[in-house]
């Protein structure tokens, strides 16, 4: 600071010396006072500056002291210089900044949505797992690939590439997958089993609508027509590739969780759950046997074997239906064996034995309708056309209910022959005798009266009793079991084979027929080589004469289809040794046959058709037939009753 003590005082004037001296002393005092105050101010200013500069006394300040100015010991002053971690921090930071890299990576443009995911979930997961930052270009510029910028260490960039490749490979179009017309749209078709198409669609289409809303795609179930053909149906999914893939997984999950049995009882077997399936063909009319009354039999098989059994839908034109068994292979095989044993026990109850008695059925081949009482049988009946609706019901509910209650299968023959009466409809009941009786009872309750039985009208050859229209009795001996071959409907006059009038359905008579069948004596050895059906004829007449309360002929050995005469063709002569006279049997047969013949044309009762001409032609054919099959002629039959 300036030293004001060297400043000379101001000079005084010469005039008024004494007074001037007194005035000069007053000025000096004022100057001294001002100088003193200036010094005090300067001292005060200098003291504040010294205090701020000496801020180290308070432990803080605006400027750090050099390490050398510190009052610490020398050992502590040297320690930071020997710290290896501290000395390495700057190089590590510089190395890290040098290792971060940015690389451009191309991905398919159609897979961008799949990579990003809903709400960015997929790309966030990739960045978190790889530690790499991913930036996708907003568009591809019309190119098939889009650029992605990957930023991170070389390891993280490689990890991100690997994850991206996995996602692209997973979302790569599968068979049936193609890009749609719209930008970024894709179409994929997956096959839905026919039995689960309704599950995917839902009631009124609600399920498929919910799937479309949840996945944000469009779904269409493709089928050729409204009829159910039993074939798998393609489900077409259209939308963003990622959403299409999600929708596909949702559909498969729906089928897995709700469409069938989980674990060992998975509905689709190897298609989804890894289980396998077996298809077992079942004769159409035997489906009711496998299902059982109210489904009891099929439930028992499923529970015992631990599988799922379903009948595949079909168009009803094949003679068999396919039972699909799904589950583990060993259990599927076990269930198939159970079903096969069930059918075999019903079919082969008495292999080669007689067919059901009481219906005059004499087939020369084995079939499902042959076997002891309790096996599968068939009963045909006709009802007026006006009462058909009472049996079928609205939407088939009545006939389904009767079938479920009785366990029998009931069918309306929809393709009658041209000569059928248009005012009558033919129904067929198939099942066990008990099931048929119960179904017949339920049907009669529905129509308010008895049904009109109709024997199976298929003509047969010489092996058997006089055809399906003969009097009640066991048919000719059957051969080993043959394929199921239902007889066609033919209500017209019988064919060239010998037939009699229709016989009433009498299932209760079957039990009485078999003892006589088994008790008959073997035929004459001399005739055994020429007539293989002699035993059948013997049983027939034994049963027939027992029903008529007449003694059966002694030692029967032949049938009318073979040489039965005395060698002269004359009924008046006694039969030679070893021959049997069946005159009485034929008389009784034609008496019964005549009772069933319609009235003459002149007065048809109740408008019934007159079959006199048909019966006359039938007798002529019968005579010609026996003349051909019998080398010595046939017995002379009594004249036909009046009106024939």
From Swiss-Prot:
Domain KH: 100-164, 185-251, 275-339, 376-443
Region (Disordered): 1-31, 44-94, 346-365, 447-532, 548-580
Gene: FUBP1
The protein's name: Far upstream element-binding protein 1
Function: Regulates MYC expression by binding to a single-stranded far-upstream element (FUSE) upstream of the MYC promoter. May act both as activator and repressor of transcription.
Pfam families (UniProt xref): FUBP_C, KH_1
Biased composition (Low complexity): 556-573
Modification Phosphoserine occurs at: 52, 55, 140, 630
Annotated keywords: Acetylation, DNA-binding, Methylation, Nucleus, Phosphoprotein, Repeat, Transcription, Transcription regulation, Ubl conjugation
Top-rank taxon: Eukaryota
Comp. bias (Gly residues): 14-27, 350-365
Compositionally biased spans, kind Basic and acidic residues: 65-77
Biased composition, class Polar residues, residue ranges: 81-94
């Amino acid at each position: 600071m300036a030293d004001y003590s060297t400043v000379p005082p101001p000079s005084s004037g010469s005039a008024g010396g004494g007074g001037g001296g007194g005035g000069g002393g007053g000025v000096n005092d004022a100057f001294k006072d001002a100088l003193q105050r200036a010094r005090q101010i300067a001292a005060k200013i200098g003291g504040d500056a010294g205090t701020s500069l000496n801020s180290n006394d308070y432990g803080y300040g605006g400027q750090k002291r050099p390490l050398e100015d510190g009052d610490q010991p020398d050992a502590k002053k040297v320690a930071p210089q020997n710290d290896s971690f501290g000395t390495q921090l700057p190089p590590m930071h510089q190395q890290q900044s040098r290792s971060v890299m940015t690389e451009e990576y191309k991905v398919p443009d159609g897979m961008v949505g799949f990579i990003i995911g809903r709400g960015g979930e997929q790309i966030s997961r990739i960045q978190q797992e790889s530690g790499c930052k991913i930036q996708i270009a907003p568009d591809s510029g019309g190119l098939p690939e889009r650029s992605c910028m990957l930023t991170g260490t070389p390891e993280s960039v490689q990890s991100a590439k690997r994850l991206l490749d996995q996602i692209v490979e997973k979302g790569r179009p599968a068979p049936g997958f193609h890009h749609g017309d719209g930008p970024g749209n894709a179409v994929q078709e997956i096959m839905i089993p026919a039995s689960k198409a309704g599950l995917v669609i839902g009631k009124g289409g609600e399920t498929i609508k919910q799937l479309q809303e949840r996945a944000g795609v469009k779904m269409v179930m493709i089928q050729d027509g409204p009829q159910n053909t039993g074939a798998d149906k393609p489900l077409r999914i259209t939308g963003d590739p990622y959403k299409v893939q999600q929708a596909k997984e949702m559909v498969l999950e729906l089928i897995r969780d709700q469409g069938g049995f989980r674990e060992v009882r998975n509905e689709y077997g190897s298609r989804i759950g890894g289980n396998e399936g077996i298809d077992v063909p079942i004769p159409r009319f035997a489906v009711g046997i496998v299902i059982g009354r109210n489904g009891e039999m099929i439930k028992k098989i499923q529970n015992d074997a631990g599988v799922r059994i379903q009948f595949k839908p079909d168009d009803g034109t094949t003679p068999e239906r396919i039972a699909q068994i799904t589950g583990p292979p060993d259990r599927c095989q076990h269930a198939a064996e159970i079903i096969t044993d069930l059918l075999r026990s019903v079919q082969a109850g008495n292999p080669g034995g007689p067919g059901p008695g009481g219906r005059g059925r004499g087939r020369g081949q084995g079939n499902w309708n042959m076997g002891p009482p309790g096996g599968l049988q068939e009963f045909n009946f006709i009802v007026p056309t006006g009462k058909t609706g009472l049996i079928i019901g609205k939407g088939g509910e009545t006939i389904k209910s009767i079938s479920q209650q009785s366990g029998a299968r009931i069918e309306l023959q929809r393709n009658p022959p041209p000569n059928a009466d248009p005012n009558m409809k033919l129904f067929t009941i198939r099942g066990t005798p008990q099931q048929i009786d119960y179904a017949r009872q339920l049907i009669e309750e529905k129509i308010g009266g008895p049904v009109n039985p109709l024997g199976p009208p298929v003509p047969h050859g010489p092996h058997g009793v006089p055809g399906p229209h003969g009097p009640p009795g066991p048919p000719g001996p059957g051969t080993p079991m043959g394929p199921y071959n239902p007889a066609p409907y033919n209500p017209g006059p019988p064919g060239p084979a010998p037939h009699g009038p229709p016989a009433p359905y009498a299932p209760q008579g079957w039990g009485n027929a078999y003892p006589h069948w088994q008790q008959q004596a073997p035929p004459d050895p001399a005739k055994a080589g020429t007539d293989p059906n002699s035993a059948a004829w013997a049983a027939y007449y034994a049963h027939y004469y027992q029903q008529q309360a007449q003694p059966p002929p002694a030692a029967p050995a032949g049938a009318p289809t073979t040489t039965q005469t005395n060698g002269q063709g004359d009924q008046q002569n006694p039969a030679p040794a070893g021959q049997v006279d069946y005159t009485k049997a034929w008389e009784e047969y034609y008496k019964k046959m005549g009772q069933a013949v319609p009235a003459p044309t002149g007065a048809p009762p109740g408008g019934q058709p007159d079959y006199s001409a048909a019966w006359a032609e039938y007798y002529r054919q019968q005579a010609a037939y026996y003349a051909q099959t019998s080398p010595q002629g046939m017995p002379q039959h009594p004249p036909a009753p009046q009106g024939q």
